Amino acid sequence: MKIVSTGIYYALALCAAAALVAWLAGPLFAIPLILVALFCLYFFRDPDREIPAGPVAVSPADGKVVAVKPEGGLSRLSIFLNVFDVHVNRTPIAGTIQKVQYKEGQFLVASREECSTDNEQNIVTVAGDGTTVIFKQIAGLIARRIVFTKRPGDHVALGERIGLIKFGSRMDVLFGPEWEITVRPGQRVSAGSSIIARRLDRKS
């Protein structure tokens, strides 16, 4: 399984610190650092996913659907990621990155409804095949580092990796009326492979 390079750097740094602690204080005192290093490798895992075909949108993140509701003429789907979920993010549709907007904010617990508007976040607009979808990478109480690897003008494939949020977070996806959301609150979804919406104006 792939590991995001950031996780490897963290793990190596922790192992170096563990070696120093073991030398200065004894091996038992190094065990907590070794365990944290192993968790970093687990947290930053990046499994391959089977991307579905058809006029669909896929989940941009692993996690639990916590909300599906109208918002400003659009439909908002919210996904909460706990610290044990894969945190590599993927684009929900194929298209071109139109806009990337960084918004400063708070670091409320990502499962809370108000974090969709109040927390620090990246707001990304993707347009393709006659539709526009907006998704938000939202920082949480623990996650305070949002990584986005694309730029406006970049083309992205359905389910392509586009970044990550470190340590517990949330992702929102905003769909227009041409989309039908196919998941409900309480469902678990996987980034890149779980279908979360279908085009109403396109045949499968």
Swiss-Prot record:
Site (Cleavage (non-hydrolytic)): 168-169
Function: Catalyzes the formation of phosphatidylethanolamine (PtdEtn) from phosphatidylserine (PtdSer).
Main location: membrane
Record lineage: Bacteria, Pseudomonadati, Acidobacteriota, Terriglobia, Bryobacterales
Cofactor: how and how many bound: Binds 1 pyruvoyl group covalently per subunit.
GO cellular component: plasma membrane
Protein name: Phosphatidylserine decarboxylase proenzyme
The keyword Plastid belongs to this UniProt entry's keyword annotation: no
PANTHER family in UniProt: ARCHAETIDYLSERINE DECARBOXYLASE PROENZYME-RELATED
Keyword field contains Membrane: yes
Record pathway: Phospholipid metabolism; phosphatidylethanolamine biosynthesis; phosphatidylethanolamine from CDP-diacylglycerol: step 2/2
Active-site residues, record numbering mapped to chain: 169 (schiff-base intermediate with substrate)
Record PTM: Is synthesized initially as an inactive proenzyme. Formation of the active enzyme involves a self-maturation process in which the active site pyruvoyl group is generated from an internal serine residue via an autocatalytic post-translational modification. Two non-identical subunits are generated from the proenzyme in this reaction, and the pyruvate is formed at the N-terminus of the alpha chain, which is derived from the carboxyl end of the proenzyme.
Catalytic activity: a 1,2-diacyl-sn-glycero-3-phospho-L-serine + H(+) = a 1,2-diacyl-sn-glycero-3-phosphoethanolamine + CO2
Molecular function GO terms recorded: phosphatidylserine decarboxylase activity
Gene designation: psd
